[in-house]
């Protein structure tokens, strides 16, 4: 279950396309703090994973430019805390995680205070790709969602299966 959560959580890192640019090192310094998962899509179905809600995600800039991401998700009635260290590479906006098994990209959105996260990795021996939209404010932003859909589509991911998770300040199993 942890590799599945890591793969999906690392989908927090954005889609590459011509009109989306990787975030610069200076911009990455500004990503520390609280972020809200606004939308996500992956290229595979995970029937065993019923994402019910998410808490705000915390990103922390570590020494050497690495990032730590922490989020708690209510999945199939159970709170799952996910914590990952994203290791900086020589390419701005590009990170690796889980011993290099996952490659993550932070891409700036055209909408202020929003980023699109894209991740490629492997889960149960099969390749998996995911895209997430995060923003500083929990309210949905249609312009940011349109930007996200374009980025997901440009990477070959379905825009028909976009999930917009319910926001929750804390994880409480059994709450609605």
From Swiss-Prot:
GO cellular component terms given for this protein: extracellular region; extracellular space
| Tissue specificity field | Mainly expressed in lachrymal and salivary glands. Also expressed in the prostate.
Signal peptide extent: 1-18
Q: Name one GO biological process term.
A: proteolysis
Q: Name one Pfam family in it.
A: Lipocalin
SS bonds (residue pairs): 79-171
Keywords for this protein? Disulfide bond, Secreted, Sensory transduction, Signal, Taste, Transport
Its domain of life?
Eukaryota
Major subcellular site = secreted
| Single Gene Ontology MF annotation | chloride ion binding
Instruction: Tell me which CDD domains the record gives.
Output: lipocalin_1_3_4_13-like
Tell me the compartments it is located in: Secreted
- Subunit: Predominantly monomer. May form homodimer. Interacts with LMBR1L; this interaction mediates the endocytosis of LCN1.
Function statement: Could play a role in taste reception. Could be necessary for the concentration and delivery of sapid molecules in the gustatory system. Can bind various ligands, with chemical structures ranging from lipids and retinoids to the macrocyclic antibiotic rifampicin and even to microbial siderophores. Exhibits an extremely wide ligand pocket.
Q: What family name appears in the similarity comment?
A: Belongs to the calycin superfamily. Lipocalin family.
- Identify this protein by name: Lipocalin-1
């Amino acid at each position: 279950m942890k590799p599945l959560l890591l793969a999906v959580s690392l989908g927090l890192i954005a889609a590459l396309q011509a009109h989306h640019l990787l975030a610069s090192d200076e911009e990455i310094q500004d990503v520390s703090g609280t972020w809200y998962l606004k939308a996500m899509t992956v290229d595979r179905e995970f029937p065993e994973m019923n994402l019910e809600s998410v808490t705000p995600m915390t990103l922390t800039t570590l020494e050497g430019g690495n990032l730590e991401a922490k989020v708690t998700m209510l999945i199939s009635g159970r709170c799952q805390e996910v914590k990952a260290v994203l290791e900086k590479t020589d390419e701005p906006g590009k990170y690796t995680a889980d011993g290099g098994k996952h490659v993550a990209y932070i891409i700036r959105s055209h909408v202020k205070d929003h980023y699109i996260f894209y991740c490629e990795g492997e889960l149960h021996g099969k390749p998996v790709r995911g895209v997430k939209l995060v923003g500083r404010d929990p309210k949905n932003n249609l312009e940011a969602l349109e930007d996200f859909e374009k980025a997901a589509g440009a990477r070959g991911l379905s825009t028909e299966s976009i999930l917009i998770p319910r926001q929750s300040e804390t994880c409480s199993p059994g709450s609605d």
